[in-house]
């Protein structure tokens, strides 16, 4: 009798466990908080605002393109993620996917691209962003790099369907969907929040924290460039770029690099020598379009609204639209300039002139930076 009761108890416990597993998995599948289940229904007020996608790019953007099957991939940092609308990519380049990820390193971009081809995505064109901070040994906000591949697919499935984090994500999705005013990452990888800045509080106090480790004052009138710029740039990043070039060449992929606008706040605090060395090293890459000296992007004074910048780090939708237009039109671009060893001296000279003009427009910022460097704060 006791054995029979024990058997029934274990059977009931097993049935409840299975039922609980099915219930949790079913609820998570219906809510679909990560947006990975393409056939899941869209229910207003329940699963329209998938906020979990916003913070899960390194997972989600491995798998999204498998079902979307884009012809063009835009790879880059949060500057791409927030501003580059794949819907603006047309003609032979459509459809496109925004593979922008916060603080994306060059090696992560390489792994993403190789993983996409491994998964059979029919990529024909790649627009690859080159941002100065991607080449530093350390970058605030950079996460541990996670290789792309099929080896972790089962683990990823469990993490997004049957786990505590998946349940929490489902609850957050329902809560945000009820509010219906949350900006979320779309299925094509685009999270549209890079609006023009209104000029108020444009440069946050935190700029000093990252700036003081890159430059030191040499006198009251001059901020010196880093003494050893090469030590600040990761050689591995440049080697990874060479691998990307060879990979795309081997698979007949049209690869186009682009250097998006760099706000003078960054340029001034990093120093000209470092910037020159970085430009020199990327100028040997094929098909590099530089937007550093584009006249339209000089709308960066600290004292008035910014059409082409959403903050001191990110560009706006308007800037991204112009860059997309040029990337598709290459080599007949209207706004950017081809960067190669022949054009390098001219681009550097123009950029230095622009930076000097900006410093004259913003003397308070320049003097404040010098004072901060002298005090070591």
Regions found by a protein language model. Give the residues of each.
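N-terminal Lys/Arg-rich, disordered targeting/topogenic segments
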Residues: 1-9
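Hydrophobic membrane-insertion alpha-helices, especially the h-region
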Residues: 12-32
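Alpha-helical transmembrane signal-anchor/signal-peptide segments
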Residues: 31-56
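Short extracytoplasmic
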Residues: 47-74
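Membrane-embedded segments
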Residues: 68-161
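Secreted/periplasmic serine-hydrolase-like ester/acetyl group-modifying domain
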Residues: 130, 139, 143-251, 335, ...
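Flexible, glycine-rich surface segments
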Residues: 213-304
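C-terminal regions of proteins
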Residues: 269-377
